[in-house]
Amino acid sequence: IYVKDEPIFSMAGIYDEWLDKTTGEVVKSFSIITTDPNSLTDYIHNTKHRMPAILSMEDEERWLDPKLAKTEIERLLRPFPPERMDAYVINNDFLKKKADDPTILDKAS
C-alpha cells in the first residue's frame, strides 16, 4: 500500500513519556492512530476494518501543533482518500527477508 506521487508519507501518532513509579524508569511509548478504512484498505485489511490515519504533506505540520482544535484533529483523522493511494501484491517470502533487503517490497511475479 502506498500514497501515489509521495515516496514517503506520514501517519498520525501519539507519543508520551511517563515515570514507572515501581522502577523509577522513564518509559517512552507511542502508538499509530487508526481510523475507519477507505475502500482500498478495507479490501486489503478486511478483518479488523481499520487503517492508519495517513497525513497529507500539507497536514503534517498541523498534526504537530499542540494547540490544534478538536474539530481539526477529527478532520485530520478521517480516512485518507482511496483515489490518492494504490497497492500491489509482494512475494510471500518477505517474512524470510531482512528489513534492509532491497527486494523486500518487489512486486510478486
Q: What would you call each of these model-derived segments?
A:
Residues 1-109:
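A structured binding-face within diverse protein domains that lines the active/interaction site
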